[in-house]
Amino acid sequence: MTASLWQQCLTRLQEELPSGEFGLWIRPLQAEFGDRSLTLYAANRFILDWVRDKYLLRINSLFTEICGADAPTLHFAVGRRPTAATVQMNTAAAPVADVRIGPAITVPSWTSKQDAMPEINHKSNINETYTFENFVEGKSNQLALAAAHQVAENPGGAYNPLFLYGGTGLGKTHLLHAVGNGIRARKPNAKVIYMQSERFVQDMVKALQNNAIQEFQRYYRSVDALLIDDIQFFAKKERSQEEFFHTFNALLEGNQQIILTSDRYPKEIDGVEDRLKSRFGWGLTIAIEPPELETRVAILMRKAEENKIHLPHEVAFFIAKRLRSNVRELEGALNRVIANARFTGKPINIDFVREALRDMLALQEKLVTIENIQKTVAEYYKIKVADLLSKRRSRSVARPRQLAMALAKELTNHSLPEIGDAFGGRDHTTVLHACRKIAELREESNDIKEDYSNLIRTLSS
């Protein structure tokens, strides 16, 4: 058995999987070869279980395809193997817009000795109600959740820094607190600080005013994990950026975990120095997208359960179908429904919800129309709306038309026949085919996935 077998498998998997997925799960695996066997080693149990559940059948089929009857038996284990027995991929996956993979650091800060110094009292600000257990997973946040789990299990060693970006109310803050709670559950004395970026600025200003900048630096550079929300507010604050630049470097050199969030991709943050934006992408950068319909329903059902309220599934579906922009909006709507139900004593049904949320629903329906979707898609692809309505079948027109149909089904309450009629009198089966095709392409093509997400953000903002 030679290393070339696993290299061939890696090459095939890299071709088949999205770059971010390959880099997060497959590339870090290490292979040990035995007598007619191959053992794949994962860094921790979470990664091992994920890889075994998602990729076992495909890896075995590749072994059979390459080796035939001589295919090795595949085993999994947690840990690392000696260098001589280990093979990793030495070709890097191409970066994509929503996930970036960079170098990882392997030693948690609290396993290495620190210089002796007086104890500093760190106020964590971690919200104990935000945990991994009550975070609702969906396709839109799956990678971010997986990376957050790994960071909580191995702070300073899994992905450092971890940079999460996406629109308001999509769960970035929840994940920050969940990581903080996860770290402290494993290491109760860990110094974990959560903060908004504005607090870092305010603390620095106070330190300068009080001639206490060294104490400020010591405070922030002696943490085990620093979790900063909304890093985009550092924009145009040169002195704060300078201080954070040195804090960032000190933490990274000390193998101390950094997690940052923003409403946009690092390189798109205006007013932040290039050297900082470059460092933001050194570890792992992941986008969190607006939740899909099934996840929105699951969020509502979970929230209702937490409030000990019976929410009929059809009511959750009714709300989720109409409110699509973010989790915060969904939870706010449900809170209003619950408050109205408790005040009036009426049962929660669709008519009750329609009345309780009439202003929110009216606004949402006014904002997103099929006509608006058609104009937005046409502008995005630099074609004419008339092209979307025409009989033209060239890929440059057909694909945007399918995307627009899928968006109309996702973002409006129109039936398939109504959507088809709005696209040049097409049959409802054409719309159904378009929706299924786009769903497939979002799984297979990073370009289509990114286009769809960009259009959703534009139409929902």
Curated annotation (Swiss-Prot):
Its main location: cytoplasm. Belongs to the DnaA family. ATP binds at G169, G171, K172, T173. GO terms for molecular function: ATP binding; ATP hydrolysis activity; DNA replication origin binding; lipid binding. The keyword Disulfide bond does not apply. Keywords: ATP-binding, Cytoplasm, DNA replication, DNA-binding, Lipid-binding, Nucleotide-binding. It holds the Pfam family DnaA_N. Residues 125-341 are annotated as: Domain III, AAA+ region. Residues 1-83 are annotated as: Domain I, interacts with DnaA modulators. Residues 83-124 are annotated as: Domain II. The keyword Cytoplasm applies. Residues 342-461 are annotated as: Domain IV, binds dsDNA. Oligomerizes as a right-handed, spiral filament on DNA at oriC. It comes from Tolumonas auensis (strain DSM 9187 / NBRC 110442 / TA 4). This is Chromosomal replication initiator protein DnaA. InterPro entries: AAA+_ATPase (IPR003593), Chromosome_initiator_DnaA (IPR001957), Chromosome_initiator_DnaA-like (IPR020591), Chromosome_initiator_DnaA_CS (IPR018312), DnaA_C (IPR013159), DnaA_dom (IPR013317), DnaA_N_dom (IPR024633), DnaA_N_sf (IPR038454). One of its GO terms (biological process) is regulation of DNA replication. Plays an essential role in the initiation and regulation of chromosomal replication. ATP-DnaA binds to the origin of replication (oriC) to initiate formation of the DNA replication initiation complex once per cell cycle. Binds the DnaA box (a 9 base pair repeat at the origin) and separates the double-stranded (ds)DNA. Forms a right-handed helical filament on oriC DNA; dsDNA binds to the exterior of the filament while single-stranded (ss)DNA is stabiized in the filament's interior. Domain I is involved in oligomerization and binding regulators, domain II is flexibile and of varying length in different bacteria, domain III forms the AAA+ region, while domain IV binds dsDNA. SUPFAM superfamilies: P-loop containing nucleoside triphosphate hydrolases, TrpR-like. One of its GO terms (cellular component) is plasma membrane.
